[in-house]
Amino acid sequence: MSDNYNYPLDINWSTDEITSVLHFLNQVEKAYESKVDANQLLESYRVFKEIVTSKSQEKQIDREFEKSSGYSTYRAVQKAKEVEKGYFSLGR
């Protein structure tokens, strides 16, 4: 995994939408690199889903992000739902 990777962003998104998607992806990064609050990750995911309403686009973003970073948005969200409250880590 490289420390320098690209985020899967859509050029048609507004600045606010890009900021919200980046916030979600940063929460996923925190889950792998340190610890993240499950509620904060799920809240950022909720906002992300308001922007990315298509399941196929969500899966594409997850694939692209995991390919470039090694981090899975799907696994992070599943773990946050499992934990519900408090902090968790997916660090290796």
UniProtKB/Swiss-Prot annotation:
Family: Belongs to the UPF0223 family.
HAMAP family: UPF0223
InterPro entries attached to this UniProt entry: BH2638-like_sf, UPF0223
Name of the featured protein: UPF0223 protein SUB0967
